[in-house]
Design a protein with these regions (language model features):
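Pyridoxal 5′-phosphate
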Residues: 1-410
């Protein structure tokens, strides 16, 4: 990294060291010199979430929904509480929706699409957008091919909205609520949901990027399914599926295993999901990540109790970084507005080498195409990018440290 002509001494003397007291409560363990800008991949976990996971392993490690001993009862109660917390956070009614847990967002989307009965649902077209993460882009390719249906890739507007009039009748629409490139959000989300349903369609939302800082966008929406990851919203590693109960009518459940059945005979079985109180088992084959599920409950509680000052600090950091990136002639920033997620490249500098140089200064960013190969590489022909994604652990000192280094390239 010598050609960048940066030393740790230079970087640290030109920006104020981060005091742990500056950070939002829960991140006191983070070393002062460490600057984490990769929350779009996975967020750091606040201490209450870590404590919750440790408590499970140390105080009631047990298999959920299977045992009669006290540890198991504690686990069952806390897991059920987390399911309720997810629905409450999204302001969705338990009579209409259920919550299942899985590996991650990608896994959840694939569980839905791979078991979807397109003929029974009357679906004639699979629709997605150009800025989708590979979790959606590949899953919709596979689903359309399997069902022998047309797949339509619509172009999102600069503000993130989707052209509603271009969505055909009887479509399965799978789209993100917030981009992992530049944080643009689906501005006309509610109108799209209404339109798709009016046209006898079904809509599945990838909410992976939205849940940490923009979950309000999803509150009281009536999508058929919402998939997201706990590890992108300050929880432990876990996938979450929020599914409209009536959607099960259009699924042929073939990914089966323990915990999903009430009875099994030689050549037949009875699914537990046929009972409303066990409907969540439709997507929960085998033992689940009980500790991680409980830790998600702790993450939601932590998010809901965040003081206004934490949100104001994050917004201030977004503004400062956005204003800087857009003011630099040699930095090409993809963002049209501020966000927690920024992507850019510097003229004449390889982004992968820049990411390594920043790492030498204890600044952690992503470089590349961030699993959005089609849009970034093949459609827009961008070079590999740098992605900086902020979180509630971010301080103004973190932003200043990054800016101090990036100024050297202009």
């Amino acid at each position: 990294m010598g050609f960048f002509n940066l030393s740790k001494k230079q970087a640290t003397t030109q920006s104020k060291p981060v005091s742990n007291s500056e950070r939002t409560s829960g991140f006191e363990y983070l070393k002062r010199q460490d600057v984490y800008f990769d929350g779009a991949c996975q967020s750091l976990r606040p201490q209450p979430v870590i404590d919750s996971l440790v408590e499970y392993y140390q105080k009631h490690n047990s298999c959920g929904e299977r045992v009669k001993y006290q540890w198991g009862k504690v686990t069952d109660q806390k897991v059920e509480q987390t399911r309720d917390q997810v629905l409450k956070l999204l302001k969705l009614k338990k009579r209409d929706y259920f919550v299942s847990f899985t590996l991650n967002t990608t896994y959840g989307i694939n569980l839905l699409l791979s078991q979807f009965d397109f003929k029974a649902a009357g679906i004639k077209t699979v629709v997605t957008s150009d800025i989708e993460h590979n979790s959606v882009f590949l899953a919709t390719q596979s689903a359309a091919t399997r069902a022998k249906l047309e797949r339509l890739v619509l172009s999102r507007e600069a503000d993130g909205s989707l052209p509603i009039s271009e969505i055909p009748d009887n479509s399965l629409v799978v789209i993100n609520v917030m981009s992992n490139i530049d944080g643009r959000t689906l501005k006309n989300l509610r109108d799209i949901i209404t339109y798709v349903h009016q046209k006898q369609g079904i809509i599945v939302l990838d909410a992976a990027q939205a849940m940490a800082h923009n979950y309000q966008l999803l509150q009281e929406t009536e999508a058929d399914a919402i998939c997201f990851s706990a590890h992108k919203m300050y929880g432990a590693s876990l996938g979450v599926m929020v599914v409209r109960k009536t959607l099960l009518e259009n699924l042929n459940l073939t990914f089966l295993g323990g915990g999903m059945v009430d009875d099994v005979e030689k050549n037949s079985y009875l699914l537990s999901a046929e009972h409303d109180d066990k409907i969540h088992t439709a997507f929960e084959a085998g033992l689940q990540a009980w500790g991680e599920i409980i830790a998600l409950g702790a993450a939601i509680s932590w998010l809901e109790k965040l003081p206004a000052s934490a949100k104001e600090c994050l917004e201030s950091c977004e503004t400062k970084l956005f204003d800087f990136l857009k003011s630099q002639p040699k930095i090409h920033c993809l963002n049209q507005e501020k966000s927690t997620t920024f992507s850019f490249y510097v003229e004449g500098i390889d982004s992968h080498l820049l990411a390594e140089a920043l790492s030498d200064q204890n600044i952690m960013v992503r470089s590349g195409y961030f699993c959005v190969h089609y849009y970034l590489d093949h459609k827009m022909h961008f070079p590999p990018l740098i992605r900086v994604s902020l979180g509630y652990q971010t301080t103004e000192s973190d932003i200043n440290k990054l800016i101090t280094i990036l100024r050297k390239f202009n």
